[in-house]
């Protein structure tokens, strides 16, 4: 899933990446995946090579120098030794083949530069760790990557910071021009990726991107206020209003900047939920035909609302803020429209991999919406919703029964938080990959 995620987002930045680093987006993605494989699978792979070499060594005439030399060459004994007993599995340049400038921009020295006060960095243990923006550490002039989880979780934003830093050093573009181009490419790439994923989940659906509708009434006029919808999906008797938010989640320490984090939630989830709700409200006002327009006021779609039975409001974020998005409607500091489903592109990729029937996916969305409307249950992870659905495909009803049974014995519960409900989903993925 990581390769698909990065390819979706970085493909639109290919020209900019080539201008700054002289490489393609696919070279960047291949390097990240090679690092992932080396850190996660490298030890097991090299041990298998070592076992094969040992077995062949036992069958070889050890007094024959030529045979022993051929054996060392065949299995690359030096490479095995470096990976087993050295740091070869974590050597960024050797594994990725990236240019030195990119590796440098993503690396942090192991110690402060000479002349700095103190022998160690001053790091707040409960704050933002430097590794988030610098996934590599430089030791003895070489860059190493040791943490797979941080690399995959934060690489996209760390790469953006590296690109921006290198652009400033080389003065390739003005800072304003670089940021503007990146954001435009990012919006296009993320919306295109989300539309494609919904097209795979709901094959044959009508998918309309960047369409407009009147804010009030049902008649569109270029002289009256209108609102843009990122994606509208029509499948059978269902309509999905999807808003995509590519903005970065707040990069500051939540202990020092709680207001910044609240503002980020409002921008990424609250605003998107209201935009999606406005689209659904417009469609429901129309009787029976609802039209969607391009920016010039030309009708691009007509939806027969008399045949629509289910409407979904969905917010999709580029950044994974799962632990909050999964229960966004329960957060006291943002005002999310009731029934809104807030997910990340990561979650959508998981849905796309798991669901092979569009009707089952739509049934899951109905249960997911019901859970978000439930005032007394909350989840800490979007995949807990999917895990509960796999265990019981009417999980909101099951939870109600559990609450009623518990309350009949012990009294009223204000809120029940579910966590770690992904065992069956984990088993499914383990069986496929």
Q: What residue spans do the PLM features occupy?
A:
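Extended, hydrophobic alpha-helical segments in both membrane/secreted and soluble proteins
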Residues: 194, 227-231, 242
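Active-site-proximal structural scaffolding
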Residues: 187, 191, 224-225, 235, ...
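Active-site beta-strand-loop-beta-strand hairpin of nuclease catalytic cores
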Residues: 233-241, 245-251
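Acidic, metal-dependent phosphodiester-chemistry machinery of nucleic-acid enzymes
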Residues: 1-188, 192-205, 214, 218-222, ...
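Beta-sheet entry/capping signal
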Residues: 206, 230, 237-241, 310-314
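Catalytic cores of nucleic-acid endonucleases
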Residues: 246-301
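Active-site metal-binding core of divalent-cation-utilizing nuclease and nuclease-like domains
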Residues: 209-229, 233-236
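Short helix/loop capping segments that flank catalytic or ligand/cofactor-binding pockets
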Residues: 156, 242, 250-252, 324-325
